[in-house]
Swiss-Prot record:
It catalyses: a 1,2-diacyl-sn-glycero-3-phospho-(1D-myo-inositol) + ATP = a 1,2-diacyl-sn-glycero-3-phospho-(1D-myo-inositol-3-phosphate) + ADP + H(+). SMART domains: PI3K_C2, PI3K_rbd, PI3Ka, PI3Kc. Residues 1711-1719 are annotated as: Catalytic loop. GO terms for cellular component: cell cortex; cell leading edge; cytoplasm; cytosol; macropinosome; membrane; plasma membrane; pseudopodium. The lineage of its organism: Eukaryota, Amoebozoa, Evosea, Eumycetozoa, Dictyostelia. Keywords: ATP-binding, Kinase, Nucleotide-binding, Transferase. The gene is pikB. PANTHER family: PHOSPHATIDYLINOSITOL 3-KINASE 2 (PTHR10048:SF117), PHOSPHATIDYLINOSITOL KINASE (PTHR10048). Residues 821-934 form the PI3K-RBD domain. It comes from Dictyostelium discoideum (Social amoeba). Residues 145-155, 270-281 have a biased composition (Polar residues). It is an enzyme of class 2 (transferase). Residues 1568-1845 form the PI3K/PI4K catalytic domain. Belongs to the PI3/PI4-kinase family. This is Phosphatidylinositol 3-kinase 2.
Length: 1857
């Protein structure tokens, strides 16, 4: 779609396929000549389409008698060359608020509005002066003004058809086919009347019209001569709901004709016309199909038109027509099909019962006619033959054919429910029609059973003709027979659509399907009757039905009966209506409530399975069945439907349709359903699938066939799906698809599937994830899409074997020790029957091979039995007691690039110091303990893998419903565009390389292109022939003439490039104003298949929503509101809703509010509809909405009854938030949200969190529900990244020195003179050209050097952006620059991508900042993720906690971060995958993230191989321990608790071996029960001692906690480890002890026990209690007892000084609170460390309002005694160490702030908002120099030493415990 030609007109009642259409629009009121006085208005549309392959051109005229988006003024609107021109524009809209809009159901508009309309008409008609309106006025008036409506019926009513027959009067009104000369003259006349202001346009249009045939010939040649002739089909549809006159003629003196010509870029068509005519006297619905060998154009008598207005009005009208909601189009359309040569004269169709309460007139009719003439015959309307479509019965009608039809009943009249409308006796007789044209088609509609089924058969033929005839009845069978080279996808009509005939073209089956992008929570089984539809509480863009909003989002193939996919040319009628609102009466309030109740019905997945049959040559039939059916029932029913439907007629060789000859087979897994009498649900295969909510496709194949390859007869690449009905008993559904997208070659191997084993595996997977996850699998399209994509990823990356051995070693991730001794001692545990330990001394730099050789020699000397016949290669070294190995490099086998290591030993082998364990032992002066064991572990370098058959089924799964299935095939959203660009990168690279060489040629070509832009299409086509055949760039000029540089013949690749820009006012600009637009090379033009979707960048309409009501209002979970409004008497509750738009946590516009409404009742479950009949309009156009924009809604209750809009901020501050919800405005496929939805609100007592979850509160049983309706448009709006279209991602990405692949973006000039590439850095903006003054320079430097918590003001952003080029060499400044970008300005976004590529390369730790929620742009986040992916496995593991948390900031499940996390987790299951699993698993109880984390867990568990068994064992042990821990907590008394503990532990059945969640290297085989105990703290944690799996190894001791949230501890310990690495890398080893800690569930987790340590409280207690606490030498004495010699004691003192300094600095920086003697421990070797980090970031504990902790950190006199006193050298060393460590951390302030910022999404109570991190910034004092910071910290040491409250706190705590 061209940028400037994608005009969205509400009058465009047909949706173009892949062609462009232009329209001339005219509207006038019924005059006195009308016999019905209906007051309606008529519309005629003449459109021209051109197929892309066969050059079949179809012109259809649609005449519609209904409302238009203007008053009945008799004036004309003309669209010419995509630029609107107003002959005499009337201010047709009164500027009233939405609350004044009258209802569609009102028979007469409000008198005030009617009076105002007449005054406007009289004023303008008298003055003769055109009134101009600004774009904003027109846009605002569009939604704020009621539309003119026919008094005979509501605009929302459906056309109700009775008998369908031909009439001479109806036929005479059908347009005839004039000669080409007449057409050209008529066009010239139109141009003379309407285009006086632009002679060039007149000439151009004349040329275009006069050269139609030439252009068509050229286009045919350009399209590789696929067709040699052009066929034109003219279809005319006329609709009226008012009585017809006695006679009518083919033209009227009041009629006016407008023609508009458009050269279609997508379909390679020449000039054609589209005419819109209104006739108030034409009443019947007539469809005429004419086929001729030459081009034809429908014409009527033309009348003169006033002069054309100015360009200002054109722009205003352009804004209007781009963005209006659609008008009602209640016309079931029919594809232009083959000739119908014979139609039975006896017409019979099924009845539809009209509600008796409806006012029915028998004097009007709607007739549908299909006719076609042979190519040699003349196109005369008299040859038209009527084909019956629908018969509707009423009180005034009979079953016999007649011309009498009931008018549409007034929807304001109440009607009965749908179930009462079905006649007890309905019959349906077959109707046959034969075609004598190129394709013979027989269509039969019959019924033989009480349940309906629907069959669709597609036949690949070279022509593009299709006929659809449908009938309604209680039992019906629908057939669609398509003979299309490009498959058409006619939308089928279900039985339930009796009362929804107005939406006939949008019907998508019996159920209303939840579309992910519209969030329509409507039950699939919901049936809306007419009364409900007409009483929609609020329909912006679709006034009379919720269904209208739903169907508006369907693809064109589902939205149109005749609309075709992939080149289909039938018109596409979308049933979207303009805004209507009505203040409901009591009865309508109930109807409204019913509709919203149906919207709120939870969505459940239906248990259907698809059966595919390909026995009919060239056709594929797919039918749906319930899985409760048996195979024999399915086969019998399937073949019965085929036979009853007469689908086998015309086949020379009929297939055998005997059920016994066929079998049901799942081809994707090559498995046959053998038990014919057992229901599918009970089959083992289906049981395995049903656990995962999967239903595989079954194929009906002959039993003799062992393997099957799906038929690939269809060669088309566009896949279409036809939706069908579901029967009353839901027995079957049938769709049709082209075979191309479903081709699967099945392996010839007859591998037997262990189905029972797979069932067990599925049960294990879902037990690991959590039983609640199964409900997530039914949540919608995004979930299904993600699961399928993940399965495809697994299968595409599948290898029969993989190397897991590299995961067993830990190399080069620990910093090297500060001091490396010349010799290290290794204690080696030798294999054998006894415990044999041998000491080996070796050099630290010795290779592993040499050390192992030395050890084996000593082993052979000791034990000849175990070494006989063996060599050193039969053994390997491992860390004693841990699953960690010390291997030679050659023992690892073949490694991937990710597994590559860099050994430093001799001969290319690892040295001992390469291993982390050796480094740790040397750094801590510990003995190295290794074991010599057999080399069975080496088998892990060839681990075999198997593909789960569930993966194969997942890979071929499609969406549950047909509309979603089709949408997934036909969508061409932003993601599809991005993928298409990536696929073409190799071709684009060559284009970029040749740019400079062809620069001069391009300039000449552009000049020629510009000079010829106003010429005819022949010149444009000649222009295109000059393009390079290797890569043709089709440059589209958006100019006032609206000409396209036609269509290219392209031998290798064809890249359609859009040219044009948006000026500062948001208006499109083109070459018509004399400026040449940039040529964008290497970017594929965003083309929408069949024009089914509208690019968002052309929708200028303001974004708006309507808040319709509330349900389940209650204050149960809000203590403030409950206390304030408890009695409901003293304080009357009032309610209002605040709506906000956010992007990256920042407001896009000011908040908007509903009026404050009084609550009549609440808490009773009723639906409240306050007086909120005012749509909320935000001040941002839709086209400027970023991809990740979100809407936030907060419901407030208040005592204030009324307030002005300017006072609402104050009202909010005095109100109580009782619920909130967020929602993304675009779904995962880039589709803008439309239609109604019901939000289940979160009730945590806070206003909407702008970076909070976007999922509903599914956990609450009765949450408050907010009913919101989003505006709907003619077609779904798809996000288009304009910045992506104006730059190209170079496939040859630049590689930095450290191997980081960063995106390289090639930008091109926006200069008007050239299309040559820009330099890497664009010129600065005008503000950047001004010289910086001193103050600005200082301010800019301060901003660029500031920490991530600094908030940029508007002036700051302007300053940073203006001088962005100055700091491009500073990596840290990139984040500030990105924050200064206005992300709703496409030019700035494009520039941001360029700058990001040219900026100095970030370090991976710096890139973490860009993953914060503030950076919402997808490309920016992906840029950071690519850099982060350069982390080593050890570094990646260090930051894995943050990376899993920022998954919550990703708007969609499928993202680059998701991919990288999964890939890295699978590449190293031990170091990354293990913790990745537990980080996700521990939060599966959180409803906000359950869906995303569950999907990732499922994907990982299906991919991780044997690691899943390890996790299953861990989970089993944890469940058993949790049961015991809960039993202990529920028991009183010390002795009883101990008894319960011992009994419970002894009953646990442990696996033979299992890993502990703390560390996968820790392997155990059971518990040493007599060493286990419970601890005497508040939560009663368990002290557990596990028996090591390795004999003679030390046991594993852990603390198992239940009831404690360990997430804060995990974060604190992670930061401690990172601090320790910073210090070690800076040459400071502070001997920290950051013990291991992991959360495994909600309040469940494990902690590592540091052995040989005791708490300070216990040491003082053992030494005498309170008296010992007051004694300074207590700790000194204890330490001397543990270290007998002076040397050992001095060494312990040194260790204490270093560790104390480390924890003093760390606890001060992180603000660790609740520090007392029970939370500080010391080992016998002098290591001091802190535990239990329940409070941090300065959240110190208080007692009775007083702050108990006043010291900045803990440094007591007892500590000072160990150091040696204030005057000792040790104290000076301690102070110096503290200051140095403090300054090292200060240099990494940004990293620590980022680590905490990225954890804001965890929900940790003390880390909720960014302000909580302010303490961290203040503690690190980034504004101080090192000297100032050291001085400040020295003062804090003195303060801590002299603070007496620390001692008092310890005393009180000791007494309490």
């Amino acid at each position: 779609m061209k940028m400037s030609e994608g005009i969205i007109s509400p009058l465009s009642l047909s949706s173009e396929s892949s062609e462009q259409q232009q329209a001339a629009i005219r509207k006038f009121s019924n005059g006195s000549n009308g016999s019905g006085g209906g007051g309606g208005s008529n519309l005629s549309v003449n459109s021209s389409n051109s197929g892309s392959n066969n050059s079949i051109r179809k012109s259809s005229t649609l005449m519609y008698n209904g409302p238009l988006p203007s008053i009945n003024d008799g004036k004309e609107l003309l669209l010419e060359n995509s630029k609107p021109k107003v002959v005499e524009l009337v201010n047709t809209f009164n500027h009233k608020p939405l609350s004044t809009i009258h209802s569609v159901h009102n028979e007469i508009p409000p008198p005030a509005i009617e009076k105002e309309k007449k005054e406007i008409i009289n004023t303008i008609s008298n003055s003769g002066v055109t009134k101009y309106m600004t774009a904003l006025e027109i846009l605002d008036s569009t939604i704020n003004t009621p539309l003119n409506r026919s008094r005979s019926g509501s605009i929302g009513s459906k056309p109700i058809c009775n008998n369908l027959t031909s009439s001479s009067s109806s036929s005479s009104t059908t347009a005839t086919t004039p000669s080409p000369t007449t057409t050209s003259n008529n066009n010239n006349n139109n141009n003379n009347n309407n285009n006086n202001n632009n002679n060039n346009n007149n000439n151009n249009n004349n040329n275009n019209n006069n050269n139609n045939n030439n252009n068509n010939n050229n286009n045919n040649n350009n399209n590789n001569n696929n067709t040699t002739s052009t066929t034109t089909t003219t279809t005319s549809i006329l609709i009226s709901s008012s009585p017809p006159p006695s006679s009518s003629s083919s033209s009227s003196s009041n009629d006016e004709q407008f023609n508009n010509n458009n050269n279609n870029n997508n379909s390679n068509s020449g000039g054609s016309s589209r005419m819109i005519t209104s006739k108030s006297q034409i009443k019947p619905l007539i469809v005429t199909s004419n086929t001729a060998a030459t081009t034809t154009t429908t014409t009527t008598t033309n009348t003169s038109a006033p002069t054309t207005p100015t360009n200002r009005v054109q722009s205003s009208l352009d804004d209007l027509l781009f963005n209006l909601p659609t008008i009602p189009s209640n016309v079931p359309t029919v594809n232009g099909g083959p000739k119908i040569s014979a139609v039975p004269k006896k017409v019979s169709s099924s009845k539809l019962l009209i509600p008796p309460s409806s006012n029915v007139s028998s004097s009007s009719n709607i007739t549908l006619s299909l006719s076609s003439s042979s190519p040699s015959s003349s196109s005369s309307s008299s040859t038209s033959t009527v084909v019956p479509i629908v018969q509707l019965s009423s009180s005034n009608s009979t079953n016999s054919p007649s011309t009498s039809l009931p008018t549409t009943p007034r929807l304001s009249q109440p009607t009965t429910s749908y179930t009462q409308l079905i006649p007890s006796q309905q019959q349906q007789q077959p109707t046959e029609s034969n075609s004598s044209s190129n394709t013979n088609t027989t269509t039969t509609s019959s019924s033989s059973s009480s349940s309906s089924s629907s069959l669709t058969i597609s036949s690949p033929q070279p022509s593009n003709n299709s006929i659809r005839i449908s009938a309604f009845g209680r039992s019906s069978t629908q057939f669609t027979i398509s003979s299309n080279g490009i498959p058409s996808s006619p939308g089928q009509v279900s039985n339930k659509d009796y009362n929804n005939i107005g939406n006939l073209s949008n019907s998508s089956g019996e159920r209303v399907k939840n579309k992910q992008y519209s969030m329509l929570n409507i039950s699939k089984k919901t049936i809306l009757d007419e009364s409900d539809i007409s009483s929609s509480p609020r329909s912006i863009g679709s006034p009379n039905s919720i269904r209208a909003s739903i169907s508006s989002q369907l693809p064109p193939s589902l939205s149109s009966i005749g609309g075709g996919g992939g080149g289909g040319s039938g018109p596409n009628v979308v049933s979207n209506k303009p805004l209507v609102v009505k203040k409901p009466s009591t009865s309508e309030h109930i109807k409204k409530e019913n509709i919203w109740r149906q919207t709120m019905i939870p969505l459940t997945k239906e248990d259907h399975i698809k059966v595919v049959f390909e026995g009919i040559p060239g056709k594929r039939v797919i039918q749906k069945f319930l899985i409760d059916k048996t195979p024999i029932e399915i086969k019998s029913k399937f073949f019965e439907d085929l036979k009853d439907g007469d689908l086998l007629n015309g086949l020379t060789q009929l297939p055998s349709l005997i059920p016994e000859h066929y079998e049901l087979k799942v081809l994707s897994v090559n498995s046959t359903i053998s038990n014919e009498t057992l229901p599918l649900r009970r089959q083992t295969l289906m049981q395995a699938c049903n656990i995962s909510r999967l239903f595989p496709k079954l194929h009906l194949i002959l039993k003799s066939e062992s393997t099957t390859i799906l038929d690939g007869a269809s060669t088309t690449t566009t896949t279409t799906t036809t939706t069908t009905t579901t029967t009353a008993n839901q027995s079957s559904n049938i769709i049709t698809k082209s075979n191309s997208s479903l081709d699967l070659t099945i392996n010839n191997s007859n591998e037997i599937i262990d189905v029972k084993g797979h069932i067990q595996a599925e049960l294990e997977i879902f037990e690991l994830i959590g039983t609640s996850f199964t409900r997530v699998l039914d949540q919608g399209q995004e979930v299904v899409s993600f699961r399928r994509d993940f399965a495809q990823f697994r299968l595409s990356n599948f290898t029969s074997t993989r190397n897991d051995l590299s995961q067993m070693i830990y190399v080069s991730s620990e910093p090297l020790p500060l001091t490396i001794p010349n010799k290290i001692t290794i204690m080696v545990l030798l294999p054998g029957d006894g415990k044999i330990i041998k000491r080996v001394d070796c050099c630290p730099n010795s290779s592993v091979g040499d050390v192992k050789k030395e050890i084996f020699k000593k082993f052979a000397m000791i034990d000849r039995v175990h070494t006989q016949g063996k060599t050193q290669d039969d053994f390997v070294l491992k860390v004693t007691g841990f699953r960690e190995y010390i291997l030679c490099i050659h023992e690892l086998g073949n490694l991937t690039s990710r597994q590559r290591f860099y050994p430093t030993g001799s001969g290319g082998d690892f040295s001992l110091m390469d291993y982390d364990y050796i480094r740790q032992c040397v750094g801590k002066n510990q003995t190295v303990e290794l074991s010599l064991t057999n080399n069975s572990i080496l088998s892990l370098n060839q681990v075999s893998e198997k593909v789960s058959f569930i993966d194969k089924i997942l890979e071929t799964s499609d969406f549950d419903d047909y509309d979603e299935d089709l949408d997934s095939i036909n969508s061409n959203s932003f993601d599809d565009l991005k993928q298409s660009i990536q696929q073409q990168q190799q071709q684009q690279i060559q284009t970029v390389i040749n740019i400079k060489e062809t620069n001069k040629e391009n300039k000449d070509s552009n000049k020629e292109n510009k000079d010829s832009s106003s010429n005819n299409n022949n010149n444009n086509n000649n222009n295109n022939n000059n393009n390079n055949n290797n890569n043709n760039n089709n440059n589209n000029n958006n100019n006032n003439n609206g000409n396209n540089n036609g269509n290219n013949s392209n031998n290798n690749s064809n890249s359609n490039i859009s040219r044009g820009s948006i000026d500062s006012e948001g208006n499109g600009s083109g070459s018509g104003n004399g400026s040449e637009q940039p040529t964008l090379i290497g970017v594929q033009n965003f083309s929408l298949p069949n024009n089914s979707k509208l690019p968002i960048n052309i929708v200028k309409r303001l974004f708006r929503v309507n808040i319709a009501g509330l349900r389940n209002l209650n204050f149960n979970n809000n203590e403030d509101a409950r206390n304030k409004f408890a009695d409901g008497k003293n304080n009357q509750p009032n309610v209002f809703v605040m709506a906000e738009l956010y992007y990256g946590g920042e407001l896009l516009t000011n908040p908007v509010f509903t009026p404050i409404a009084q609550l009549a009742s609440y808490g009773d479950g009723s639906v409240e509809f306050p007086n909120w009949e005012k749509g909320i309009a935000f001040t941002i156009p839709i086209r400027y909405l970023p991809r990740a924009a979100r809407a936030s809604f907060t419901v407030y209750v208040t005592t204030i009854s009324e307030a002005l809009e300017s006072q609402m901020d104050e009202v909010v501050s005095k109100s109580i938030p009782i619920g909130w919800s967020n929602c993304l405005l675009m779904n995962h496929k880039g589709m803008l949200r439309m239609g109604p939805t019901a939000f289940r609100l979160w009730d945590d007592g806070r206003r909407a969190n702008p970076i909070g979850t976007c999922v509903d509160n599914q956990a609450a049983k009765q949450p408050i529900i907010l009913l919101v309706e989003f505006e709907s448009f003619i077609r779904p709006i798809v996000y288009v990244d304009t910045a992506l279209q104006s730059m190209m991602v170079n496939d040859s990405s630049s590689i930095s020195s450290n191997g980081v692949e960063s995106p390289s973006i090639v930008s091109f000039s926006s200069s008007a003179a050239s299309s040559s590439p820009l330099p890497s850095s664009p010129l600065p903006s005008p503000v950047g050209l001004k010289k910086l003054d001193l103050d600005e320079a200082r301010r800019l430097k301060a901003l660029m050097d500031s920490d991530p918590l600094v908030q940029l003001s508007a002036e700051d952003k302007k300053l940073v952006y203006g001088y962005r080029h100055i700091y491009k060499s500073k990596p840290k400044a990139l984040a500030k620059f990105l924050l200064s970008v206005n992300w709703i300005d496409p030019d700035q976004v494009t520039d941001a991508y360029r700058q990001m590529n040219d900026w100095a390369l970030l370090k991976p730790v710096q890139a973490l900042e860009i993953l914060d929620a503030k950076f919402a742009d997808e490309h920016v986040r992906n840029f950071a993720i690519k850099i982060i992916n350069s982390f080593s496995d050890a570094e990646f593991s260090d930051f894995l906690l943050q990376l899993t948390q920022v998954l919550k900031y990703e708007p969609y499940h499928n993202s680059d971060l998701t991919h990288i996390l999964i890939q890295r987790a699978l590449s190293n299951r031990s170091r990354i995958g293990h913790f990745f699993f537990w980080f996700l698993k521990s939060e599966m109880h959180t409803p906000e993230i359950e869906e995303r984390y569950g999907l990732l867990l499922e994907g990982y568990l299906r991919s991780c191989g044997t690691h899943r068994q390890d996790l299953i064992k861990q989970n089993q042990v944890l469940k058993s321990l949790h049961t015991v821990a809960m039993a202990v907590k529920q028991t009183n008394g010390s002795s009883e608790r101990k008894k319960v503990l011992m009994e419970g532990l002894s009953k646990i059945k442990f696996p033979d071996t299992f890993q502990l969640p703390l560390d996968p290297r820790w392997e155990a085989k059971g518990l040493i029960i007599d060493k286990c105990r419970y601890m005497d703290s508040k939560k009663l944690p368990l002290w557990l001692v596990f028996e090591n799996v390795e004999p003679h190894a030390k046991p594993l001791t852990v603390i198992f906690k239940v009831g404690d949230d360990l997430r804060q501890d995990i974060l604190t310990l992670q930061v401690l480890r990172i601090m320790d690495k910073f210090w070690k890398n800076s040459g400071m080893d502070l001997r920290l002890q950051p013990y291991k800690c992991i959360a495994t569930g909600d309040g469940i987790g494990m902690l590592e026990v540091v052995l040989n340590a005791n708490t300070i409280a216990n040491i003082n207690k053992d030494a005498g209690g309170t008296g010992a606490l007051l004694e300074e030498k207590t700790l000194v004495n204890w330490l001397k007892e543990c270290n007998k010699t002076e040397a050992e004691y001095n060494k312990a003192v040194e260790t204490f000084i270093l560790s104390c300094a480390g924890y003093v600095v760390a606890t001060y920086v992180m603000g660790i609170g609740d520090r007392h003697s029970d939370n500080i421990m010391i080992t016998k070797l002098g290591h001091l460390f802190h535990i239990d980090f329940g409070h941090f970031l300065g959240n110190y504990k208080k007692k009775y309002g007083f702050k108990r902790e006043r010291a900045p950190f803990i440094f007591t006199p007892q500590y000072m005694a160990i150091v040696g006193g204030k005057d000792s050298e040790n104290f000076k060393r301690f102070v110096t160490t503290c200051c140095s460590a403090y300054n090292i951390l200060r240099k990494n302030t940004d990293l620590f702030i980022n680590l905490f910022q990225l954890m804001l999404s965890t929900g940790i109570p003390e880390l909720q908002v960014a302000e909580d991190i302010d303490y961290l910034r203040k503690a690190l004092a980034p504004g101080l120099s090192d000297e100032e910071a050291a001085e400040e910290f020295t003062k804090n040491i003195s303060v801590a030493l002299n603070t007496k409250t620390v001692l008092l706190n310890d005393i009180f705590h000791g007494w309490a415990h």
